[in-house]
């Protein structure tokens, strides 16, 4: 019986997973299958695809299926479908680790209690990340569970890059910039030498993780030195339904003049803003790019503008720029967004190769051969990054 590793990413209405062989440190070739249970709270859809993209399982679950029920269904399906494998460990994507966790950690009751303290700092993700850990612990109390943090890659940011200009006692209580999407950035940092060469990897690189959640990270020698997200995953770039950077005075105005509650403001900023709020149409960039509605065009323009603004800021933190990397769902697939960003980055030395950008599939260069600053698109793989952490920390790494 051979060991397998399970990677889980639990959200408000879904549980996504990937299953890997665990006889050696995982690579993309060790993926067995992946999928998830979506639309929880409505009509849950359970779909699994093989590593080659073919459908392995596709069904609907009863309406009213809870997250805990869905977890039981998923684990039961894995055990029934793969009787020749033993589930040796599970890795969870956990968005916020605060200042406590600078790397993956074995989950204990004490760790769970510490993670619960961050629920309010990442309300879209953290409560569901931790609930999945708790549900699995009830199903399999002896199963090794590893928490892998989106904040860990930024744990050694320079102090000046983490500080807010607030009274020192608040800073000492942990009110500071943490940064997120760290699992994605860590994966890209590992891929840079192979895709772009060691000289680029050792240089001044800005990576733009663009998806429903969006952020950017300035890397020097593949280490994070500045990032756009802050105390929470609400800061920085405009996102699918999140506002990004916002004058705190707007929050005070909503509290005092509009008599909104904290929970109403949370819903507004996290779930009703961003591309969705500006366009009034959708939080999906594909829908907006296909639309000729002026509000959709305005949302796209603002999205690109905010990226260009932050790119200049991060280049300043680096003292210059050697390479720009796009990743995430939008960064990997929306050549039009890449084109617009690169055109606005011409002053930094980015010269786009329009043909290379338009035809790119997978990882590759999209800048002209004579571009002073090279530009690249590299697909990310947060699941694989988690699987590697789990393998190193669990049985495979001991």
UniProtKB/Swiss-Prot annotation:
The record marks 181, 242 as: Transition state stabilizer. Its cofactor is Mg(2+); Mn(2+). It is an enzyme of class 2 (transferase). The active site is at 150 (proton donor/acceptor). It holds the Pfam family Acetate_kinase. Its EC number is 2.7.2.1. GO terms for cellular component: cytosol. It is found in: Cytoplasm. Catalyzes the formation of acetyl phosphate from acetate and ATP. Can also catalyze the reverse reaction. Homodimer. This is Acetate kinase.
């Amino acid at each position: 019986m051979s060991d397998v590793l399970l990677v889980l990413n639990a959200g408000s209405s879904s549980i996504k997973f990937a299953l890997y062989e665990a006889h050696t440190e995982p690579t993309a070739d060790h993926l067995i299958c992946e999928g998830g249970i979506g639309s929880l709270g409505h009509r849950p859809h359970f779909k699994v695809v093989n590593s080659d993209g073919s459908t392995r399982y596709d069904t609907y679950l009863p309406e009213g299926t809870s997250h805990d029920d869905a977890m039981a269904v998923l684990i039961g399906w894995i055990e029934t479908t793969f009787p020749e494998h033993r589930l040796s460990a599970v890795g969870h994507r956990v968005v916020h680790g605060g200042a406590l966790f600078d790397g993956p950690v074995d989950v204990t009751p004490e760790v769970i209690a510490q993670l619960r303290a961050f629920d309010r700092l990442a309300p879209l993700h953290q409560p569901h990340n931790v609930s999945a850990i708790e549900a699995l612990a009830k199903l399999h109390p002896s199963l090794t569970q590893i928490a892998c943090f989106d904040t860990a890659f930024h744990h050694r940011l320079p102090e000046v890059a983490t500080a807010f200009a607030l009274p020192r006692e608040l800073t000492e209580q942990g009110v500071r910039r943490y940064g997120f999407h760290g699992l994605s950035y860590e994966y890209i940092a590992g891929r840079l030498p192979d895709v772009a060469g060691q000289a680029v990897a050792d240089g001044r690189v800005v990576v733009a993780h663009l998806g429903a959640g969006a952020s950017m990270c300035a890397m020097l020698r593949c280490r994070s030195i500045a990032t756009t997200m802050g105390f929470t995953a609400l800061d920085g770039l405009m996102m699918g339904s999140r506002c990004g950077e916002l004058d705190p005075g707007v929050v005070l105005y909503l509290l005092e003049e509009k008599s909104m509650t904290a929970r109403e403001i949370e819903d507004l900023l996290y779930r009703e803003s961003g591309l969705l709020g500006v366009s009034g149409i959708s939080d999906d960039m594909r829908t907006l790019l296909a639309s000729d509605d002026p509000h959709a065009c305005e949302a796209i323009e603002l999205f690109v503008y905010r990226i260009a603004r932050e790119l200049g800021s991060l280049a300043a933190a680096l003292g210059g720029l050697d390479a720009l990397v796009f990743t995430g769902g939008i960064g990997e697939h929306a050549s039009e967004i890449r084109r617009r960003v690169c055109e606005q980055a011409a002053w930094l030395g980015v010269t786009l190769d329009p043909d290379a950008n338009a035809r790119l599939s997978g990882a590759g260069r999209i800048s002209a051969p004579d571009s002073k600053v090279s530009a690249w698109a590299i697909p990310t793989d947060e699941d694989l990054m988690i699987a590697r952490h789990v393998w190193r920390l669990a049985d495979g790494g001991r």
